[in-house]
Amino acid sequence: MPIQVLPPQLANQIAAGEVVERPASVVKELVENSLDAGATRIDIDIERGGAKLIRIRDNGCGIKKDELALALARHATSKIASLDDLEAIISLGFRGEALASISSVSRLTLTSRIAEQQEAWQAYAEGRDMDVTVKPAAHPVGTTLEVLDLFYNTPARRKFLRTEKTEFNHIDEIIRRIALARFDVTINLSHNGKIVRQYRAVPEGGQKERRLGAICGTAFLEQALAIEWQHGDLTLRGWVADPNHTTPALAEIQYCYVNGRMMRDRLINHAIRQACEDKLGADQQPAFVLYLEIDPHQVDVNVHPAKHEVRFHQSRLVHDFIYQGVLSVLQQQLETPLPLDDDPQPAPRAIPENRVAAGRNHFAEPAVREPVAPRYTPAPASGSRPAAPWPNAQPGYQKQQGEVYRQLLQTPAPMQKPKAPEPQEPALAANSQSFGRVLTIVHSDCALLERGGNISLLALPVAERWLRQAQLTPGEAPVCAQPLLIPLRLKVSGEEKSALEKAQSALAELGIDFQSDAQHVTIRAVPLPLRQQNLQILIPELIGYLAKQSVFEPGNIAQWIARNLMSEHAQWSMAQAITLLADVERLCPQLVKTPPGGLLQSVDLHPAIKALKDE
């Protein structure tokens, strides 16, 4: 086949494979466009979980008639014009791919009007060449996007959609995350004609805790400790739940934002977990809603197709900063609560040195302790002050927010007599669920670790293999399958075909979906860890392995796959090692307690120390 330029629709559909995973992906991209347009009200209408209709209506600035056709074209955007703009990006969108990708796998209609125009205009793309048609329409200032029949022209993708309830739950979760990021925007969500969520905008200086409670629940609000922490260009604000009262339900609340962009960043999660480690049980997770503000030049947001991940230029600095910010609030909580009256000379309190996998602590310097209000004591009406407008909070932020908490709780708990302390189990050591902190990388694939004064070497490829095996091994539910945009078709022998058919149920639990005919097998979906692998090599080797087996256990197959996956890292960096260890500690805690052979080797420094002393 000769080299040729792909038709626009096919090119957009390929891009949609990364951008548009499910209806929730469409909602996220379109709502972020509305926020970038300055909207203060966004109405979202969903039908049949988003498979039939997704309608996003906003009161933003709108799009000019002359730019409507461009809005549906690939790589057309108003957010950036040069590489310098990309490196300092503050808007949520910037690639100009979303609308083109969505319109290629659905029937998309874009209606918009700007304040300077007397009438609105409507645009839609159709045909193989994605020609855009523009016609007059009636519409107030703002934009409405209608997405009908998602994946109507890609049946394979539509087949992988879950139930209507499941898909809507994903949309609901996306809206929760966005509502937590933008307290100044009213967001209404309806499903099949019924209003499901109404998040009203909080006026400047208003009580953001009301919206926090509506989204995260009263249980989180009651245990929330407010954070305001700053160092240079870094600012951390938000709430973390008291680890001593964290429940499994609360542990599901883990929201972090970087410059207003919702993230699932492992480095941030690791720093928070390390700060709470000595107060959490072995199986507990922290609950938090945190906002990190950082110089846009110090973070790269262009590392994930859906912009779910970021890369910090100084990851160790960010890790230590977040760790110390969370730790300071938890340490303050241990102090005796003080009244709300201003303390003219607050006593300084030294923050203990932290233990983090990211390395040396840059922030363990004395900090001023803010008075912490008792959580259940009603405040006098005459002595209260309005909460400082978040995120531009003034000093004393935690004290002011304590007042808000008590006003929201309304019903104070009755005074109780102090109880004698109950015997408690000894707390786990802070390092009990951690390999230690990474000091440096040795010989490109080993991490030098320090834990409790002991030095050890960890083989990063071995840790990566154990992590892959944990990711591939099915638990209570099968591993999630990721559909391939272009299925892999392979020729197989009769023996190989028979083995595949016997192993089909086990492979399905691992997220591997295939279809076979007389002499061929077509791989239609694989689990996420396999998406970046060379399947042309891996799958034939897997089929050969299965042909030699008589028993097909998902665990054994997952172990074989993990051992045969190619590593993504030829030369490991500190940031990659920290991220890997955070994932291993979270998914494979048993490796910390009883490391298998070949993973961890202690380093005896006593001969070297003795030799130095003998000189």
From Swiss-Prot:
SUPFAM superfamilies referenced in this protein's UniProt entry, alphabetically: ATPase domain of HSP90 chaperone/DNA topoisomerase II/histidine kinase, DNA mismatch repair protein MutL, Ribosomal protein S5 domain 2-like
InterPro entries: DNA_mismatch_repair_CS, DNA_mismatch_repair_MutL, DNA_mismatch_S5_2-like, HATPase_C_sf, MutL/Mlh/PMS, MutL/Mlh/Pms-like, MutL_C, MutL_C_dimsub
CDD domains: HATPase_MutL-MLH-PMS-like, MutL_Trans_MutL
Pfam families (UniProt xref): DNA_mis_repair, HATPase_c_3, MutL_C
GO biological process: mismatch repair
Keywords: DNA damage, DNA repair
The protein's name: DNA mismatch repair protein MutL
